[in-house]
Swiss-Prot record:
Principal location listed in the UniProt entry: nucleus
BP-aspect Gene Ontology terms: ethylene-activated signaling pathway; positive regulation of abscisic acid-activated signaling pathway; positive regulation of cellular defense response; positive regulation of DNA-templated transcription; stomatal closure
Alphabetical keyword list: Activator, DNA-binding, Ethylene signaling pathway, Nucleus, Transcription, Transcription regulation
Protein name as it appears in the record: Ethylene-responsive transcription factor ERF096
Gene Ontology terms for molecular function: DNA-binding transcription factor activity; sequence-specific DNA binding
Gene that encodes the chain: ERF096
Compartments it resides in: Nucleus
Length: 131
């Protein structure tokens, strides 16, 4: 596999973690160092930029500030902000660039009690209001 195009740059926009399929779509994948370099499939995308952003999101969630990204300016790595704040900024940029019709929500995992509280809050409007 040719890794000469590290990051943005080489001929006609090669991105890290992105391959062009013969039929014109772009495939994104990343290697998981926690699983001995096992490939993790990220999906097939209409544009190389969408695939590169999917790679960046996976790389940042796996490696944090140590990740080598295609679009590092979309992640506030140098400042002291939390990863959820940095991801919120990149998610909006990624969502606006995506031509996909599906809606994706991402939550930073804190602990089970926070998840349970969020789920309970979501069920409250369905139970009716008591005065």
């Amino acid at each position: 596999m040719d890794q000469g195009g590290r990051g943005v740059g080489a001929e006609h926009g090669k991105y890290r973690g992105v391959r062009r399929r013969p039929w014109g779509k772009y495939a994104a994948e990343i290697r998981d160092s926690r699983k001995h370099g096992e490939r993790v499939w990220l999906g097939t995308f209409d544009t190389a930029e969408e695939a590169a952003r999917a790679y960046d999101q996976a790389a940042y969630s796996m490696r944090g500030q140590a990740a080598i990204l295609n679009f590092p300016h979309e992640y506030n790595m140098g400042s002291g902000v939390s990863s959820s704040t940095a991801m919120a900024g990149s998610s909006s940029a990624s969502a606006s660039a995506s031509s996909s019709s599906r809606q994706v929500f991402e939550f930073e995992y804190l602990d089970d009690s926070v998840l349970e509280e969020l789920l309970e809050e979501g069920e409250k409007p369905n139970k009716g209001k008591k005065k």
